[in-house]
């Protein structure tokens, strides 16, 4: 479907949700190499488990406020009082297990940074620093392998489907559909 701006986009983009539209046009599938943003997207994807990405994306600013702008050091050291406050924050998804997982995942993220020099190096080494183009999948051998490794390291809510969505979000996998103006084969 061609939009009023003359562009063709992936079928899942809602023309009525400008947040979702901007996300598709400006973020999704674009390679991310900044550890701060890689951490933010990982935590947001963790909260997506069992929900729609649109639901999480619509709460993104509230998540940023609640999670101290996704400051890795702060999140990794959250106290019980902070966790209780997060569970009471109606602006975010208040799942107790996901909130606690954010702290554990922040701690593991830090350990990976220490081991690899950055989370970026760890993540992109799986593809030799290259984006992969694939569409119409929800998991792959790549997401299986990364999911398995992250679980072994202690991360939570990092099943293969969540990791695949994460890889798409941060541009390791570009899943813009054939015809979409952001599909690399269209450019």
Model-identified regions with their sequence ranges:
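HhH-family (HhH-GPD) DNA N-glycosylase catalytic core used in base-excision repair
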Residues: 1-187
């Amino acid at each position: 479907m061609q939009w009023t701006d003359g562009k063709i986009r992936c079928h899942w983009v809602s023309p009525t949700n400008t947040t979702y539209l901007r996300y598709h046009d400006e973020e999704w599938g674009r390679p991310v190499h900044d550890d701060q943003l890689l951490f933010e997207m990982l935590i947001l994807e963790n909260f997506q488990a069992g929900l729609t990405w649109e639901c999480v994306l619509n709460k993104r600013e509230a998540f940023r406020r609640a999670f101290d702008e996704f400051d890795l050091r702060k999140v990794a050291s959250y106290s019980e009082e902070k966790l209780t406050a997060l569970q009471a924050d109606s602006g975010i998804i208040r799942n107790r297990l996901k909130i606690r997982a954010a702290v554990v995942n922040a701690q593991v993220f830090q350990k990976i940074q220490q081991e690899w020099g950055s989370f970026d190096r760890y993540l992109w080494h799986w593809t030799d620093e290259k984006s992969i183009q694939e569409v119409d999948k929800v998991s792959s051998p790549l997401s299986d392998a990364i999911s398995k490794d992250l679980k072994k390291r202690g991360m939570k809510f990092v099943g293969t489907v969540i990791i695949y969505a994460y890889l798409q979000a941060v541009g390791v996998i570009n899943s813009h559909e054939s015809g979409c103006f952001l599909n690399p084969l269209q450019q």
